[in-house]
């Protein structure tokens, strides 16, 4: 199993009172006491960050009050793989009838929730096939905050929608999305257990980040496969800064930048979605601090990557904190938390090999 830099006890304490909730395959499993990545192009919408629930419904990422149906039996998702992962996490796998193809290309997600394979692909965001959606006869659809045009077309079919934060996510809006999804899907106990997990991990992350001295904060650059492919989305800034890092580029900086610009930023750490060894060997950037020190990392990938909004993202915060500040974050055992999360929320026992695969890119 791969060695991580986090070696002490974990913080998550998931309540056993949320036991026997139906998840994958319609089977119930007990939530035992446990100890222990799709960013689209963001638009200007501001995700709702106030109370997750309204008097007669829930409030989505667009600030709309969405009525809670008596039941939801046929679910459509049109916001990449993370939306499907969210639905599965909160008990909706058996009810999926429409899901983007990206979810089917996530091996571990598909292994845990094989029901995804039977859902039809109707596209994503604004590029959706309305005829395919209509033919699947969903009675509810989870959509993205970045796709007003596609969402409106779905609503014209008379299908109620809930807008997930996706690329516009903040820490608070994501937490609200997951609470609300559990309410909509009729699994509020699972939502309560999840928020207990979230609050413990994110609280531990915040506490650890506070111990990082101002003059010891590391500058972090996030890129694609090439060093010149900047990928400092707003979410990347949230991720980096929440653990005590400093974003090298202004949040929202994406696309081509020059090697000279990266050299001027001179990041202490580089996060990449590409090949780590290729970046370390790039002759153009050998004088950059991160390259000199071998501080180039790629986020772990579970059912989805840990560097993008998804239910596994608290694990991503803890992991990144440990890469930047191993001593400050030594109190969170990320591997143990990952195993507990999969058991408690997916009803799935990770093998040692699967756990190693999740962390192997890091």
Residue ranges of predicted features:
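C-terminal segment of N-terminal export signals and the immediately downstream linker at the start
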Residues: 27-57
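Structural recognition of the beta-strand scaffold that forms the well-ordered cores
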Residues: 76-78, 97-100, 140-144, 162-164, ...
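Alpha-helical, coiled-coil/dimerization segments enriched in small aliphatic residues
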Residues: 231-254
